[in-house]
Curated annotation (Swiss-Prot):
Family to which this protein belongs: Belongs to the RapZ-like family.
Protein name: Nucleotide-binding protein NE1849
Function: Displays ATPase and GTPase activities.
Endpoints of the signal sequence: none
Amino acid sequence: MQVIIISGLSGSGKSIALKVLEDSGYYCVDNLPASLLVVLINHLQTQQHAYVAVAIDMRSGENITVLPWQLKMIDKSIQIKFIFLEARTETLMQRFSETRRRHPLSDKNITLEEAIRREREALATLTGLGHHIDTSSLRPNVLRAFIKDFIADSRSPSQLTLLFQSFGYKHGIPLDADLVFDIRCLPNPFYDPQLKELTGHDPEVIRFMESQPDASKMLRDISSFLGTWLPAYIRDNRAYLTVAIGCTGGQHRSVYFAEKLALHFHDSAHVLVRHRGLAEYKPHYARR
């Protein structure tokens, strides 16, 4: 039996993630009080459900800090995957404004910003339980695609998933990054009029990057660092490791680096690539 637990901040995309799981054949339970997790799983196991997804957050009004204890009580034969979704405060405020929904912790005595802050503090102990996704810059279709890839990976044999994410510093560092590499010191294709509108996927940009000695050296250095320490993360039983590569806009250099690193480590782990700065990006697994 496999159980995917979804938690995170209100407005971060939990409903979207749960709907994708439901459409993928998971038996889904929304807004479960954390104290009932073990009871629910034991019951569903007797009903022979193979794939279960559960959303647990602040809506139940219960103390969610019992969740880590509940997870320890689950039978070891059951595979547990945990997804924590969050977004920047300004992004969440904009989403609540657009949908005109009420934040579950808001009342007439506190502002929306204060409600978000309180929820973030209450959920802080859960951020390290599993895979952490910052949805601040993710469109709904992009989040759906990522959850689908997460499902595909969860149904494969257990192994570290290594996620390479390109991003632009002008939009902020991804909240879910475990390691961050800043490559803004490298020559920028953006200033070449013939390359400005292209991306790190395009052959012209690839040739430009490959012609830069510093880019090649930095790529080797990052590869060497990850190659040295990746076995330690695997020995630590990490399920996910997110490596963020940042340039100015997240369009050229970081995209090129993320793709190159993904190919380099293709045989060392389940490798997933995500490009936050590309409007039409879809998450994908590296292929040789």
